[in-house]
Structures are given as C-alpha cells and as structure tokens.
Swiss-Prot record:
Enzyme class: transferase
CDD domains from the UniProt entry: LbH_XAT
Signal sequence coordinates: none
GO biological process assignments: response to antibiotic
Descriptive protein name: Chloramphenicol acetyltransferase
InterPro entries: Hexapep, Trans_hexapeptide_repeat, Trimer_LpxA-like_sf
UniProt xrefs under Pfam families: Hexapep
UniProt cross-references to Gene3D superfamilies, sorted A to Z: Hexapeptide repeat proteins
Length: 212
C-alpha cells in the first residue's frame, strides 16, 4: 500500500483529505503524516465510523498535526471499570451464552481541539478531551484531560510544563482571536504574527478595530 503523502516535509490540509462526516475541521489546519503513511481519517479511532450518532472530532483552524497523532473516539468502548468484569460481552453476538449481557457503552462527548494548536508526533488524545487555543502538545503525550489555552503539555499522562505567554498576553490573544480574521487582516498583521511581541500585535489589532 502506497504512502498517502509524497514528502515528510510537506503536510496536506485536513479539508483536502478528511472524508469522515464525524470529523469537522477549520481552515488551513494540516496533517503531516508521511512517517505513518495514512490520511488523517485514520487518526480518528472510531469503533463505528459510519454512524452519525457518535462523538464528533472538532479541530479548529491553523492547527499543525504531526505524523501518527491519534484521537480515541469510541467513548468507553463498552468497557466498564466499575463492573465486576470489563469484558464487552454485549458485543460478542456470535456467542449465545452472552445473550443476557448489558450494553456497557458510554459516549464521552465530542473531542474539541482549539485553533492554532500544535500537536507533536504520535500524541494520543483520550475521548472527550478539550484542548484550548494555542496549546502545544508534545510528541507521544497522552492527553487524558482538558488542556488550557496556550499551555505546553507533555508526558504520560500529559501534564502542563509551562504556559507559552504571560496571563495578560494570553488574555489578549484570546480576545483578538486572530484565527477568525479575514485573510486581508491576517496579511496586514503577518510581520507581527511571526514575532513574540504580543503587545505590539494587540496594539495593531486595536488600531485596525478603531478605523474599521
């Protein structure tokens, strides 16, 4: 089977490769999956990918996703930790002895990845987590809980290493929500988007707001 990607140095936009209707993606987000060979559809691990009543994977705009990232999208997969057995008897239809089993499946809710999130190679996201805008997820991190905006997390389980910016700068970035801007506004701000000078970017945005 051939590699979906032509080069390890160039990803493909999610909007050009996602076919699963349960995956919703924003503009310009991309997946760079050369080292695993498959399209982004296979990063979302559904038990029943063709159903429309399952949890959704929602990814914002301007996200960068490394090769082999995985999003577990099957709720508890029918395994109940609080029961005497975690075995999913209900789904073994071929065995008559299990006919009286109760369906232990529980959904986890949609998995939400914010805007401008960077996801490292082979990071894994457990069902129902929410990742804030601007977060960085380290390679092979196991994300089991929600991640705050502009946090850098890593490890197994993933823990916050530090914040990318001061609380004030983060508040201003969230207020600006540059990922929602028209392309003309992004173009005008590009010299500042490519620096760490958040106060200058905020002043630029305020000035454009005042003259709009």
């Amino acid at each position: 089977m051939g590699n979906y990607f032509e080069s390890p140095f160039r990803g493909k936009l999610l909007s050009e490769q996602v076919s699963n209707p349960n995956i919703r993606v924003g503009r310009y987000s991309y997946y760079s999956g050369y080292y695993h060979g498959h399209s982004f559809d296979d990063c979302a691990r559904y038990l029943m990918p063709d159903r429309d009543d399952v949890d959704k994977l929602v990814i914002g705009s301007f996200c960068s996703i490394g090769s082999g990232a995985a999003f577990i999208m099957a709720g508890n997969q029918g395994h109940r930790a609080e029961w005497a057995s975690t075995f999913p008897f209900h789904f073994m239809h071929e065995e008559p002895v299990f006919a009286g089993a109760v369906n232990g499946y529980q959904p986890a809710g949609d998995t939400l990845i914010g805007h401008d999130v960077w996801i490292g190679t082979e990071a894994m996201f457990m069902p129902g987590v929410r990742v804030g805008h601007g977060a960085i997820i380290g390679s092979r991190a196991l994300v089991t809980g929600d991640v705050e905006p502009y946090a850098i997390v890593g490890g197994n389980p993933a823990r916050t290493i530090r914040k990318r910016f001061s609380d004030g700068d983060i508040q201003n970035l969230l207020e600006m929500a540059w990922w929602d801007w028209p392309l003309a506004d992004i173009e005008a701000a590009m010299p500042l988007l490519c620096t760490g000078d958040i106060p200058a970017l905020y002043r630029h945005w305020k000035q454009r707001q005042a003259t709009a």
